[in-house]
Swiss-Prot record:
Residues 664-680, 910-932 have a biased composition (Basic and acidic residues). Its EC number is 3.1.3.16, 3.1.3.48. The gene is SSH2. It is found in: Cytoplasm; Cytoplasm, Cytoskeleton; Cell junction, Focal adhesion; Cytoplasmic vesicle, Secretory vesicle, Acrosome. It comes from the Eukaryota. Tyrosine phosphatase activity has not been demonstrated for this protein to date. Residues 9-18 have a biased composition (Low complexity). The active site is at C392. One of its GO terms (biological process) is actin cytoskeleton organization. Belongs to the protein-tyrosine phosphatase family. This is Protein phosphatase Slingshot homolog 2. Protein phosphatase which regulates actin filament dynamics. Dephosphorylates and activates the actin binding/depolymerizing factor cofilin, which subsequently binds to actin filaments and stimulates their disassembly. Inhibitory phosphorylation of cofilin is mediated by LIMK1, which may also be dephosphorylated and inactivated by this protein. Required for spermatogenesis. Involved in acrosome biogenesis, probably by regulating cofilin-mediated actin cytoskeleton remodeling during proacrosomal vesicle fusion and/or Golgi to perinuclear vesicle trafficking. It comes from Homo sapiens.
Amino acid sequence: MALVTVQRSPTPSTTSSPCASEADSGEEECRSQPRSISESFLTVKGAALFLPRGNGSSTPRISHRRNKHAGDLQQHLQAMFILLRPEDNIRLAVRLESTYQNRTRYMVVVSTNGRQDTEESIVLGMDFSSNDSSTCTMGLVLPLWSDTLIHLDGDGGFSVSTDNRVHIFKPVSVQAMWSALQSLHKACEVARAHNYYPGSLFLTWVSYYESHINSDQSSVNEWNAMQDVQSHRPDSPALFTDIPTERERTERLIKTKLREIMMQKDLENITSKEIRTELEMQMVCNLREFKEFIDNEMIVILGQMDSPTQIFEHVFLGSEWNASNLEDLQNRGVRYILNVTREIDNFFPGVFEYHNIRVYDEEATDLLAYWNDTYKFISKAKKHGSKCLVHCKMGVSRSASTVIAYAMKEYGWNLDRAYDYVKERRTVTKPNPSFMRQLEEYQGILLASKQRHNKLWRSHSDSDLSDHHEPICKPGLELNKKDITTSADQIAEVKTMESHPPIPPVFVEHMVPQDANQKGLCTKERMICLEFTSREFHAGQIEDELNLNDINGCSSGCCLNESKFPLDNCHASKALIQPGHVPEMANKFPDLTVEDLETDALKADMNVHLLPMEELTSPLKDPPMSPDPESPSPQPSCQTEISDFSTDRIDFFSALEKFVELSQETRSRSFSHSRMEELGGGRNESCRLSVVEVAPSKVTADDQRSSSLSNTPHASEESSMDEEQSKAISELVSPDIFMQSHSENAISVKEIVTEIESISQGVGQIQLKGDILPNPCHTPKKNSIHELLLERAQTPENKPGHMEQDEDSCTAQPELAKDSGMCNPEGCLTTHSSIADLEEGEPAEGEQELQGSGMHPGAKWYPGSVRRATLEFEERLRQEQEHHGAAPTCTSLSTRKNSKNDSSVADLAPKGKSDEAPPEHSFVLKEPEMSKGKGKYSGSEAGSLSHSEQNATVPAPRVLEFDHLPDPQEGPGSDTGTQQEGVLKDLRTVIPYQESETQAVPLPLPKRVEIIEYTHIVTSPNHTGPGSEIATSEKSGEQGLRKVNMEKSVTVLCTLDENLNRTLDPNQVSLHPQVLPLPHSSSPEHNRPTDHPTSILSSPEDRGSSLSTALETAAPFVSHTTHLLSASLDYLHPQTMVHLEGFTEQSSTTDEPSAEQVSWEESQESPLSSGSEVPYKDSQLSSADLSLISKLGDNTGELQEKMDPLPVACRLPHSSSSENIKSLSHSPGVVKERAKEIESRVVFQAGLTKPSQMRRSASLAKLGYLDLCKDCLPEREPASCESPHLKLLQPFLRTDSGMHAMEDQESLENPGAPHNPEPTKSFVEQLTTTECIVQSKPVERPLVQYAKEFGSSQQYLLPRAGLELTSSEGGLPVLQTQGLQCACPAPGLAVAPRQQHGRTHPLRRLKKANDKKRTTNPFYNTM
């Protein structure tokens, strides 16, 4: 079927009546203005059907060249118009059979507007000689009066009788006959309706044509042939003589066979006589006496085929004729037409929206390749409330196959169900054998896609189309019933339904106020369950487990009872509400956590929900209110339980030892972080449960904040998404909170394991682990990571209401300062845990689930399932890591996490998706908030703080980084670590608070975040003593944060992408930088970022300056936060990728931030580095430093000494430049070499990771995993140095360096924090070590936790660094310089790209950056 356009030059008609008007719109104006008129016809072989202009503008502007599908029909139409009056138009032209081979005959239905403005029609017989297609003669004029009758003759023809005249017409094909009958019946109906009788005033214009009959006599005789004249067709063959005895039985058989034949034959090239002959051949009998019955049945079948079949409410399946029936299409509400043919044109391009799949109905046709596009097109129609017509030629094979494929994907049906459904509604449906095979293949693809939860078949622009693939707990996100079709989807729906009410609680983070000694722990206790597992991601295992949990109703109680991942499946609110269940949840949550983490990682976009910082703030506040870890102000029992969990931390440490052995065994993995993430997947999940440890009331408050944020107008849409995620969080959090202490332990274990692995691979690792074991703070750090995850989940909720967030931030700013210690650490822990979970989920679904379970037990490390699971997971991880290498494992974790986030992260940067950018912004905002809170922190600290907020774990890493930071600057002096101890503790308390908030946004910091301890007990930047510490801590914290930011930025951004995508949009982010730190809005911490939002709104440069200023002034915290936010926003908005790079560089610059690097960072720190660094250090000192310093005071010296050897030369600069962020590339020398080893593994494993992860998340995941492993660091660092992006990243790396610098500045600016920043540097290095466990210089705090925290910080920092980069382009050169000075920034850079590019690009960038920086960022280099 083709669309042809015919030019007609109106020639004045001598007999045209003045009152006659043109039939088709546009004719009159054409007549009044003598110019060529174009008429459009829908043509098939032997027939042309006039296409009315849709609304004047629909006339297709098609060139008048010959249409290859129209044959000579176009020329014939052109000639016919010469005989017509200008006011008349051709409604139909049908080619008829002719007795003479050299003659072509057409039956033409001509219409015009009559005297009463009614349509009057006549039939003209046109003759063409075979040798001249341009000359036409008229041989017949037959007016259609009201008494016109039409009869089928049974031989493929029909007779028209009117006014005692009978004429026989035999179209050349069934299709042509069908077209002729349609037009004739329509004309006859009009004649009957208006009573056109002979002799009336109607059809007076017939005389014009009667006077123009000019065909030769033979042609006129043929037109006037009598009814009794036999057809020239021969009789049926006399082969079959016996007539069926049972006529009815024969007729039934004829109906069946006739339909089959008509479905198989091209009706344009076959006559009813030939169809009858075919029937006779098949039935082996003569059907001559059934010919009338056959013709009538044929018309019935044609009628059925000619009307589109409504398959779904928004989908019609039809033929080319349906596509050409404008009136019918408009009456049915069709606005979209999917044309699955190569031979049929779009008939009304100006009226309908077309999508063309240009293929033939052949077995060689690859229709499968187009089904993703067709799915999007149909979904687009549905989204806009319109109907879509899917048509091919007959609506039998090509279009039917396309609709079946759509049903399979849209509703999650298998092929049999979809085929039966479509066949039931359109019985002629019959895909050709090749299409059926392709449908079977598509079924497998959809199943696999569902299982690995990737976005292979889901476009980002139309992600809402395949809602069933979205995380089960996506309260705010649209959870379509279709999505729920799959078991995973159903579970998701259940979760959503169950979790929706608890959304506010979801983000609840119970932070059990602990003694001054346990302040860090309090922070850790406030773990945010950020992971919303996309049920579909783990279509198989996770889906089943999750489904079971969801089906259970998996409320907090369910989660508590189940040792799977109830948090993900349970309602956080319930869990939060039920403090008593918290411990149980913690115990059983780990198993679920791992799976959940996997699911979350896979469904990062939808799954990860940033929990509002407000919630984080509440828990933080609570700890300050109740210093005793066992006396949570809101829920003592819960806190007590948390306390118990803290006690259990020792068990975790023993588990840590086990993990150390494992890590040693799987040192080849050289991805301690990767391993930790896998092992810590369970731990991270435990950490998620750790949120439970947070005071229940605090959790409730946080959840309430989350819900309030979600309810805000801005949050309305995003809020819904956030809510869904919050639900997931809710489910996660309630168990999380119950398990918070437990989770902390789990996080500690994970952290420990990670560090131990790193230690196995490097010197600093073991020491770090040792510190962690003695220092319960580390456990809280891990919890912090999880909290950050939870917070991050909250953040998306908050993001919906940017304004609210900003306000909350402002209001919560003071609180942030106050509760920084508690909230931040908790947030950090949660984030890290979540990140770890996400990353863990990424390595391998099955493996991850197993690991998750094992990790969780590990996280519990208590007698029981957790411990056993830990052992099992250790074994599995060991085997898997040995098999794939630690780096690969981490890569797969990151990759999986990115699979959903991937699009968010990678796409977010390019797309400017709100999700990813907002997470970064949020992260950055939080950093500035932390800065504000810590007023004393240097720019570096501000960055750290921001990261802290984002991942509670980040603070601990920052603390480590802080210690390390000074080391690079001042050397690995043990006293720096010791000195930091006290200060760092305080700072950490404050920083983690902000960091938790910040981290909440960048949930993706899986393992790193865990490292952050709840040292953020120094909640108030107002603290005088802690204040100075905070300043120092902020610096060191910022470095740690940077590191964490790097990894976390990648991971978190990914997760946030999902969450933020739902809740925050790039425009919103840029418009409302405050929104970025949704966590702020969510929790009191969010209030603090509010100050930053203002700054954030300011130019990125301002932000950098502000950060610098913030470090200098008591308000630095606020200014830093603001600037960070600004930078973050800028970073996200301008180019998530580039900014990510920047962040990555800064974050991952953990190589050698030596004194020069530190100074360089300092120099760059004010514009770019400052903001980023401040949060980093802040967070570090605040959460990890405070706790660790107090608990690891003695250990700090040892750890520093142990870590100094490695980090001092290599690690120190490493830490200094972007210690935490650089956890990706931990030790400069050893780490580099190890990174190289891991690099191959990570690359390999990345290749083995989920496809979606591989696509975008692969690189990010790889980077993230690499960050974790110090073995990979050396390798990656060189690569990073080489990375061209290094320069871009270097500014961010510089941020890490800047952190050191900021520490120095902070020391200068904030005497209160004399050299805490330096200890932070050490810690940064430690974090680096944690990531690369080998390079943990100051072991004041558990290196493992710091490492994890660092990882979180890195990832988190990355986004922030990116923001900074965006903020002040001028800082870019500085970053480059930093990169030159320290290789570390390069890794950070890589991390940032990781966020941007879905983890693959980041590695490359990191590589370049590392090469440039010559730091130990092997992880990034690996990619």
